[in-house]
Amino acid sequence: MLHWGLDQEKHPVFIQVPGGPVRHAKGPVRKSYDDLRSEVVRRGSKIAIFGLGSLFDMGEKTADILRESLGFEVTLVNPLFASGLDSELLDNLAVNHDIFVTLEDGQLEGGWGQTLASYFGNSDKHVLNYGIKKDFYDRFEADKLLHENRLEPGLIVADIRAALRRCAN
């Protein structure tokens, strides 16, 4: 992404220093971000998890737990950008997915996940959004704040299992 940011001349580029550990690519590195498409990291069915930004790793851990406990692979997506939706991907996933899960480290209300939820607003899809509730946080323990907002793989898995039961009815 850094190479792309240095080479492209069409738009301004914002480069942010990672707040957590650097995630190294496991495969070929994407060289163009002109086409704002999300990256499907794992292909599965029934459940699609979108881990935006620093919460991609949490999405990966959640997908691992689901694979072990449910016995099938779920789809894991790295959205790569928060300024819009990859509607082509969403339409393709809607064919064989019933539950869409969004994880973001920003404010839940009015965030990227709620934009995705509104995309499926008139459908039979279930969307679970996770982020930080709107509030003023002066001093806080990060782990406690994440727990209070159900931003832990085990809690997310419990919510997904409940959504699966609702889908079955």
Predicted regions, residues:
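Thiamine diphosphate
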Residues: 7-169
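Internal gly/pro-rich beta-alpha loop/helix module
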Residues: 1-7
